[in-house]
Swiss-Prot record:
The keyword Secreted applies. This is Dermaseptin-3.4TR. It is found in: Secreted. Expressed by the skin glands. One of its GO terms (cellular component) is extracellular region. Keywords: Amphibian defense peptide, Antimicrobial, Secreted. Belongs to the frog skin active peptide (FSAP) family. Dermaseptin subfamily. One of its GO terms (biological process) is defense response.
Length: 30
């Protein structure tokens, strides 16, 4: 449902933000 979609979207956003933060710390993913 909508709630599950929101949770999945939030998780994806958090994952992206975490990757960006870690990348800025000096650990590029790619």
């Amino acid at each position: 449902g909508l709630f599950k979609t929101l949770i999945k979207g939030a998780g994806k956003m958090l994952g992206h933000v975490a990757k960006e933060f870690l990348g800025s710390e000096g650990e590029p993913e790619s």
